[in-house]
Amino acid sequence: MKISIIIPVYNVEKYISQCLESAINQSLKDIEIIIVDDCGSDKSMDIAQEYAKNDSRIKIIKNSQNMGLFLTRCEGIKSATGEYILNLDSDDFLDLRACEIAYNATKNGYYDIVTFGSYYWNNNSASVFSEFERSSFDSGDEFGSWFFRSKNISWNIWGRLIKRDIYQANLDFLISINSRLIMAEDVLAMFVIYHNCQRLNFISDMLYYYRYNPSSSTNDKSIENLKNCIDNFEVVIAKMREFASKNQCDKRWQKLYISLGVHECDILKRRLKIKEGKFGLMDKIGAFIEGRWFVIRRKLRVKFGI
């Protein structure tokens, strides 16, 4: 089995058919499709069950209770048997040649991870979400130098093939977070996975469609959700620091990932203050200074590697 496609499912009945069609109709047929039911309340799983009846490559796992995207995805990865893992969110979809192109880019399993470009999909229109020039690295140190000086950092867990044995070897640490994450779960997973990858390939092909879903947790601007997102980032930042203290992580991207996590968390805290009507003059001044300093730091990092 070349690739295991992991699809966590929760209340996506409007989109799941397009997601599953894009997985089932891949030009590369040597794949398995693992659907993990996170106990939603709509007809998503009824639709998934119908597809499973007609395709033996589809395997369905049901959580005992709602666990959230992060732990649900981990449940699917536990059961995977493919050489590589491809994470696919159930409201997104793939180019029909995604698996074939990405697997060919592994060079017969030489690369631990292959990353490809993605589109942002909104109202049946595609725009670039992330894209890469072709770049390959034969050591973690070589990758670390390049990654640290990259202007735009991609930490999505989707849009990649990741060697299953590397992913599964780190599941215990990831699952030990024991928290129902709705935000920042990709940051933690990629922080750990990057540390354990030595050979990495970035390709220019645009193979993933990331859908704007107004009902998703990431687009929920309520006070309660903002508080949950802040809590999630704080948990993830603490977990990254814990992992770094126990492992010899590359200092450059360790610093980069954690500082970006803190920056994103600070943005959410400002949004919460604005929502609560507590964003005063000193907050505005602080936000302006922090924003300018963030831009300066990024320019120094990209241009001089510091």
Functional labels for PLM-detected ranges:
Residues N156, F202, Y209-I306:
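C-terminal subregions of glycosyltransferases and related glycan-biosynthesis enzymes
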Residues S22, D37-D46, Q65:
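A conserved acidic beta->alpha catalytic loop
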Residues I85:
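Short aromatic/hydrophobic "clamp" motif used to bind/position activated sugar donors
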Residues E21-D30:
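Short, acidic, metal-binding catalytic loop of nucleotide-sugar glycosyltransferases
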Residues E142-S222:
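Conserved nucleotide-sugar donor-binding catalytic segment
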Residues R97-S130:
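Conserved donor NDP-sugar-binding/catalytic core segment of glycosyltransferases
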Residues N63-A80:
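Glycine-rich, basic loop-to-helix element that forms the pyrophosphate-binding segment
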Residues D30-C39, I61-N63, S90:
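Short beta-strand/loop segment that forms part of the nucleotide-sugar
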